[in-house]
Amino acid sequence: MNFQQLKIIREAARQDYNLTEVANMLFTSQSGVSRHIRELEDELGIEIFVRRGKRLLGMTEPGKALLVIAERILNEASNVRRLADLFTNDTSGVLTIATTHTQARYSLPEVIKAFRELFPEVRLELIQGTPQEIATLLHNGEADIGIASERLSNDPQLVAFPWFRWPHSLLVPHDHPLTQITPLTLESIAKWPLITYRQGITGRSRIDDAFARKGLLADIILSAQDSDVIKTYVALGLGIGLVAEQSSGEQEEKNLIRLDTRHLFDANTVWLGLKRGQLQRNYVWRFLELCNAGLSVEDIKRQVMENSEEEIDYQI
């Protein structure tokens, strides 16, 4: 038995038993993945996966039990690698933050500035992605902290702390007819071509839910991953734009006006996520404390390091 075999078991569950995706995630070949699975099953004398021909459909009962153990072993192995750093150098290193464009561009600058004043020898790496990509980076230990409005708070492998709540607002040209409607309604917005975020990011689900509750179908002609792209196409006259309220910027909005839509769409929460049970350097805890003064380092540590093996659920 070896770590690669355990990684394959864990990744198979994460990738819905698609061995091609498992091989891609672990930078190996599909034949190599299949060989490792066969060798581990032969060594243990059990069937780990439910099969139909060569296709994996799920996990057997022994396989489910093995998955929980594999997750614990791999997480502890990661902690061992971090242990030396924790005790030898706690004021320098690299802090990797996986976040969405909106948070990287509009919410994090002041926090990062304050963090650098406290830890001038820590280098920061910002990785921008979707909430799903951010969660995967946390799962794999490729990011220390994940920041997003979607996905992080309902992942049993992660611990998520609230940062702040934010609403959407509507961007339109100064002379647009919607500027004359008070209060703004979903019915009036639905009459115009709409530009907003793509599925799965920056509160898009709140937008879709609001229109669905009214039995309306928004005419979303263009969806994008970040606010700046949305603003660009609104400025070109392609449509009106629904964006995060905190994404304001005078230069890119000089020919646009923002309209309040807090009464139309539910507010969103930005979450700070960490991998459950993973040791961290002190500056990781302090970064979270800078984001949310209501959190103490002791409380963050306690929640992150709580035993949660029974909560791991890969939909098996």
Question: Each predicted region: which residue ranges?
Answer:
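N-terminal short secondary-structure element
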Residues: M1-S31, H36
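Central regulatory/effector-binding core of bacterial HTH transcription factors
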Residues: T88, S92-N154, L217, S223-A224
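Hydrophobic hinge/microswitch elements
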Residues: T130-A143, S149, T202-L259, Y314-Q315
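Secondary-structure junction motif
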Residues: L178-T179, P193-K214, Q280-E289, L295-S308
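A late-sequence structural motif
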Residues: S107, R258-K301
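A short LG(V/I)-centered, amphipathic sequence patch enriched
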Residues: E41-E61
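Acidic, Gly/Pro-rich loop/turn segments at junctions of secondary structure
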Residues: L118, G129-W192, E245-Q251, D266
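Beta-alpha-beta core module
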Residues: D155-F161, R165-W166, S188, D228-G277
